[in-house]
Amino acid sequence: MVRSGKGIQNKNATEVTEFILLGLSDNPDLQGVLFALFLIIYTMTLVGNLGMMALIKIDRSLHTPMYFFLSSLSFVDASYSSSVTPKMLVNLMAEDKSISFNGCATQFFFFGSFLGTECFLLAMMAYDRYAAIWNPLLYPVLMSGRICFMLVSTSFLAGFGNAAIHTGMTFRLSFCGSNKINHFYCDTPPLLKLSCSDTHINGIVIMAFSSFNVISCVLIVLISYLCILIAILKMPSAEGRHKAFSTCASHLMAVTIFFGTILFMYLRPTSSYSMEQDKVVSVFYTVVIPMLNPLIYSLKNKDVKKAVKKILHNYVV
């Protein structure tokens, strides 16, 4: 998916100081519809994720490792959606669709940081579910408050560190030709396509880091769930198996949607790359997935439902 560069840069060309985000569609009849649709989705994303964080903070019964991770995930979802969606909404209604060079680099960095953090965080959550089901007696020791904090901190450090490398590698390049990004946010492939520098090294580094990070996270998830499956099958009672599976079902669904989209997006061969297809998939994981996660984790979660009812009874009734 990452393309090689343009060869030797033209030193006499004027360096780009801002970019133009072409967006999802140039059809003016669709702009208002898309604005209304994405505004609704973004509002639901903020309400769902910030509401989940507040609920976990308020209700002491949710002060467990599982919900500590979920609260962190909600923060990450709200953050990486907010790094892209507000600018996209503005561009849908504004004639000026420009973004400054530094603004593009900032968006690129924070989106990559939170996206990478989510990748690692979902892997840590899979390990948490494994620890809870494989050995419930040792679970408080294996997932103490200190260990949970270290795992979440490591996820953030890995996500932000990875994004810092990508941002430095991308924005050290020269952009001296067209400044029109065929996307609704600053993403790697369209930026490398615009560069008049040799992007061969960028392609190698980005593919190596992306592949390692995604594959390592996926392996942690797969190994954790394989151990979980073995533990569930060994349980003597059907009720115990059902209860154990129900605690993992929502996370498994979220993991499948997220990593399935990321694997399709970033690890498919260059020959199958299509910018229009890329935009559609990008909408799904930048806008839709952050909205879905609070719904996935709360709809069939008895603890969350109970906490919501308790708060409604205490503060509304």
UniProtKB/Swiss-Prot annotation:
Q: Where in the cell is it found?
A: Cell membrane
SS bonds (residue pairs) = C104-C196
Per the record, the major location class is membrane
What the entry lists under Gene3D superfamilies is as follows: Rhodopsin 7-helix transmembrane proteins (1.20.1070.10)
Q: Is NAD among this UniProt entry's keywords?
A: no
Q: Which UniProt keywords apply?
A: Cell membrane, Disulfide bond, G-protein coupled receptor, Glycoprotein, Membrane, Olfaction, Receptor, Sensory transduction, Transducer, Transmembrane, Transmembrane helix
Residues exposed to the Cytoplasmic side: 54-61, 128-140, 225-244, 300-317
Sites of glycosylation? N12
Q: Which residues lie on this side of the membrane: Extracellular?
A: 1-32, 83-106, 162-203, 266-278
- Provide the membrane topology annotation: Multi-pass membrane protein
TM annotation in the entry: 33-53, 62-82, 107-127, 141-161, 204-224, 245-265, 279-299
The record's GO molecular-function terms, alphabetically, read: G protein-coupled receptor activity; olfactory receptor activity
What's any one GO cellular component for it? plasma membrane
What are the GO BP annotations of this UniProt entry? G protein-coupled receptor signaling pathway; sensory perception of smell
- Give a short account of what the protein does: Odorant receptor.
PANTHER family reported for this sequence:
OLFACTORY RECEPTOR
What name is this protein filed under? Olfactory receptor 5AP2
Q: Which organism is it from?
A: Mus musculus
